[in-house]
Amino acid sequence: SRSAPFAYALQEADRAGRLRLHVRVDERSAAFLALGMAKLSRRPVPVFTTSGTAVANLYGAVLEASHASVPLIIISADRPPELRGTGANQTTDQVRVFGAAVRMFHELGAPETREGQNAVWRSVVSRMCAAAIGTGGRETGPVHLNVPFREPLVPDLVPEGPWPESLEGRDGGAPWVRVQPSKPQAAGVT
């Protein structure tokens, strides 16, 4: 599956206690579970899915999240750009598939083992979370992050070598992105 890199990483994070993983085979069910969790907690909840029509199956929950201003984060695996439009399996056009229903769309480049990737990924994820919770004057709501993966999609049994930079984050826990909180509006003011 195109989302195998997500599956392996999420399973490892769940085992380490860094997150609680809820696995659903049906994408619609996964999206509506995440929608309910986000609606109840008022915190962003991610939904990871594979490529192709699986992404379209999330559309109902994305629309509900948009109309109800619920911070839902859609993270979809995708084919790399060079395999799009070639007739390859599961090459549904996922770029901006949710249109105006999402507060922000971003597509990352295919992952590469080189310095600087950690900062790029963390910055993009921080900006997506900020958009989902409505900072910077935006309305709270769903966002979509599309991530193309090249093969191999499963981890190597023998790694190539260490990652070229620390994955620990910034010194002292400093954020990757600083966002200004939205100013509350008076009742009746738009």
Model regions and ranges:
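N-terminal alpha/beta PP-like core and its mobile active-site loop of ThDP/TPP-dependent enzymes
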Residues: 1-190
